[in-house]
C-alpha cells in the first residue's frame, strides 16, 4: 500500500481503520506534520495506535 497524504476527517478515518479496537493517541501536531504535510504509510499510522 502506497503512502498517502491524509488530512482532517480522512486522517481520523484511516486511524480508525488501522487501529480498530485499540483506539489511537491523537496528537494533531505530530500526525498532521507526518501524514498531511507529507505522505505517510500504514506503518507510520500504526505508531499512533494505543
Curated annotation (Swiss-Prot):
Principal location class: secreted
Keywords per UniProt: Carbohydrate metabolism, Disulfide bond, Glucose metabolism, Hormone, Secreted
GO biological process: glucose metabolic process
SMART domains, per the entry: IlGF (SM00078)
UniProt GO MF annotations: hormone activity
Protein family membership: Belongs to the insulin family.
Function, as annotated: Insulin decreases blood glucose concentration. It increases cell permeability to monosaccharides, amino acids and fatty acids. It accelerates glycolysis, the pentose phosphate cycle, and glycogen synthesis in liver.
Assembly information from the UniProt record: Heterodimer of a B chain and an A chain linked by two disulfide bonds.
Protein name in the entry: Insulin-1
Amino acid at each position: 500500500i502506497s503512502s498517502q497524504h491524509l488530512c482532517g476527517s480522512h486522517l481520523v478515518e484511516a486511524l480508525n481503520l488501522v487501529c480498530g479496537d485499540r483506539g489511537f493517541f491523537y496528537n494533531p501536531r505530530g500526525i498532521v506534520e507526518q501524514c498531511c504535510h507529507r505522505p505517510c504509510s500504514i506503518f507510520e499510522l500504526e505508531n499512533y495506535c494505543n
